[in-house]
Amino acid sequence: MDTLLSLANGFSVAFEPSKLLFCLIGVFLGTAVGVLPGIGPALTVALLLPVTFKLDPAGSLIMFAGIYYGGMYGGSTTAILLNAPGESASLATALEGSKMAKAGRGGPALATAAIGSFVAGLIATIGLAFLAPWLVELAVKFGPWDYFALMIVAFVTVSATFGDSPLRGLTSLFLGMLLGLIGIDKLTGQARLTFGVPELLNGVEVTTLAVGLFAVGEALYVASKRWREPEEIIPIKGSLWMNKQDWKRSWAPWLRGTAFGFPIGALPAGGAEVPTFLSYSTEKKLCKYPEEFGKGAIEGVAGPEAANNASAAGTLVPLLTLGLPTSATAAIMLAGFQQYGLNPGPLLFAEKPDLVWGLIASLFIANVMLVILNLPLIGLWVRLLAIPQPWLYAGILVFATMGTLAVNPSPVELGMLFGFGYLGYLMRRYDYPVAPMVVGLILGPMAEAQLRRALQISLGDPMILLENPISATLLGIAFIALVAPFVMSGLNKFKAAED
């Protein structure tokens, strides 16, 4: 009952004209950047951080969430019509969606993707609304040792999830944690790693790092490669709508995809790629027409797209209740909260209920807006693919520079922006994930503060981390998550050597 009352109050916030406008802008931008390969919601939110710092926090965060949801929708368009997923989570959709488009059924493929995303987003957002308060009640009971252990789990799982190598993920994470040490030590008041530069006394701005790594780094990386003409877009033939048979074959995959996407997205090592491919393989086994798989089975589009969007809502569960990002976009959204002096977690639900529940309520509205916008404007989304990449990324560089200077007109800040941008370019070139570095900068100082608090309570005894059951369990999970990839890699090499 309390959840329904809170949600009703949230809708009263979300239906304010300014909030509706922010939501509309968010879903429109999100769909547009989801369509464009290589852009994505994480880069877009990072670009908008500097220009939204003076806006209303609730409106800005609603817009960021709309961009996140819209990016999930938009990625399916290029996956189906171009066989080039705008988002990695749309890879599974491309397997059958592009085949449907080539067979003249691009319209039904786009329709089942859009409606499946709507159904999954709606169900998953309901799950978020009812699961979040329960997790908040649990998190209130956490001591500093439990929070420290939880952040260790986040560090390990984020490092293992992003990129192909856990070791490279950990390297990126440690770089971010090292940057988090810069500034004034809150316990002793001493300057750390500032090298006599006054601008570093307040630490490294998360916004500068995020924009540098995601926007400037991506632009430099694209510029370093030889630009290619976009691939030929598969034209949409026939009806844009689904027939009775398509509806009959799609509804069960939508529900199964949602069941995969939401819980896996809510896990610290979840993400959207795992549930989408899990949904694809499940639909391939359960399909009554297995001969169609690989040639354009509608179940292979319906299930993965539902899983994709459900995982987006699932990602917001640990972000809002525990302050733990489980995707690149969630990490940038966490930076968005922090630029307004807000820390997601149990206290945020108690201190800013209108903001939190307004954000959750806006997700329902965003889903409705997206299903209305996607199909009628399909021609507009396709035309975006004709924008030359040099123009697009040159615009990103200019926008990133102007936005950063607007927040902090300092030569040092500008130097850091392009320094982080060049670092982001090098990390992409040598296949190091950039998201763990942002997570390290955000969560590193928080983990340090919780560890210090725990040691102060225990009079310096580190065994307090193992004496409490919750923290001991979490540290055990972190250890297994850290060791497992290396053990599996060793076993695979051993088996390969035997063969």
Describe the residue ranges of each PLM region.
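Re-entrant/interfacial helical elements at transmembrane boundaries that shape
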Residues: 41-50, 64, 79-99, 130, ...
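Short helix-coil transition sites and intra-membrane helix breaks within transmembrane domains
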Residues: 33-42, 80-91, 123-127, 264-273, ...
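Membrane-embedded alpha-helical modules
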Residues: 111-227, 339-493
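Membrane-interface alpha-helices at helix entry/exit sites of multi-pass transporters
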Residues: 58-62, 99-116, 288-300, 328-331, ...
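Membrane-embedded alpha-helical segments of transport systems
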Residues: 69-74, 115-127, 135, 179, ...
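Helix-loop-helix hairpins and the membrane-proximal interhelical loops
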Residues: 1-60, 133, 140, 191-297, ...
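Transmembrane alpha-helix interface/packing and boundary motifs in multi-pass membrane proteins
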Residues: 27-41, 70-83, 158-163, 259-268, ...
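A structural-propensity feature for long, helix-poor, extended segments
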Residues: 68-79, 86, 297-322, 326, ...
